[in-house]
A protein has these predicted regions:
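Glycine-rich Rossmann-fold phosphate-binding loop(s) that bind the pyrophosphate
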Residues: 9-12, 35, 178-181
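Intrinsically disordered, low-complexity N-terminal regions enriched in serine/proline/glycine
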Residues: 14, 132-137, 181, 190
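N-terminal Rossmann-like FAD-binding beta1-loop-alpha1 element of flavoenzymes
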Residues: 3-30, 184-193
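Glycine-rich flavin
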Residues: 1-3, 19-171, 204-208, 213-217, ...
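Rossmann-like NAD(P)H-binding beta-loop-alpha module
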Residues: 169-211
Length: 258
């Protein structure tokens, strides 16, 4: 099969490029290895995190209204219902992207693309063999994936990356977030508002490294009251699975602790 334009990757970069090219009159084939369009942002990043942060914010606002003399009972968290609602939000948006692709006559092919020549790809499909496409032009928008840190890869289901954390399989009694960047703080906030005792460890001397310090100060003040602890200038030097939890070794200004 021949495609004038092939776009590899159905995330925000890929589908936007495919839609614009189609609007300009090109025949477009969009290859995405996931079963749905949207990429990391929509499927396991920005959208699910903001959906869960909305839940956390509502819980926080109900609690903070006590200062105004308005009292609500402690919330009862139905984690299965929260997870289901998050997936419905994702499903609605991915369904919308599929309709937009259809309206523009963008051919969406599900599978993993492999270059076999300078203008040829083979798309390997999980249950349907493979297809070969030649093309005139190709846009690479293959995205990224979480980097795995070998020292933290101890084979324990208790150690999660952001993708696993967004699955919201359960809400642990306690949670350590390694990294005080925006992803770590988002996940920490969600789990803290849902009932976990959350601690954050950050290697540098402040949360959100690289962000404007005038913005970080009020944020730090807010999350300090939400989190169990915030350890700055602290490095995680080891993790150990101890059965009913994970033992963590820190190296900070006061030396090494466990």
């Amino acid at each position: 099969m021949h495609a004038p334009l092939v776009v590899l990757g159905g995330g925000p970069g890929g589908y936007a490029a495919a839609f614009m090219a189609a609007d300009l009159g090109m025949e477009v084939t969009l290859v995405e290895k996931d079963t749905r369009l949207g990429g990391t942002c929509l499927l396991r990043g920005c959208i699910p995190s903001k959906a869960l942060l909305h839940v956390g914010r509502v819980v926080a606002e109900a609690r903070e209204m006590q200062d105004w003399g308005v009292h609500f009972p402690a919330p009862k968290i139905d984690i299965d219902a929260v997870r289901s609602r998050k997936e419905k939000v994702i499903g609605a948006l991915t369904g919308g992207l599929a309709q937009l692709a259809k309206r523009r006559n963008v051919e969406v092919v599900q599978g993993q693309a492999i270059f076999t020549a300078s203008n040829t790809i083979e798309v390997v499909q999980k249950d349907a063999g493979s297809q070969t496409f030649t093309f005139d032009h190709c846009i690479l928008a293959s995205g990224s994936r979480p980097a795995r840190i070998p020292a933290f890869d101890i084979g324990s289901p208790r150690v999660m990356d952001s993708t696993a954390a967004l699955q919201l399989e359960d809400v642990p009694d306690s949670l350590l977030v390694i990294g005080g960047g925006y992803i770590g703080l988002e996940m920490g906030t969600v789990y803290a508002e849902l009932g976990s005792q959350v601690s954050v460890v950050e290697l540098t001397d402040g949360l959100l490294p690289g962000a404007d310090r005038d913005l970080v100060k009020p944020l730090h003040k807010r999350v300090k009251g939400l989190f169990e602890a915030i350890r700055l200038n602290t490095k995680v030097v080891g993790l150990k699975d101890v059965g009913n939890g994970v033992e963590v070794s820190f190296e900070g200004p006061d030396g090494e602790t466990t």
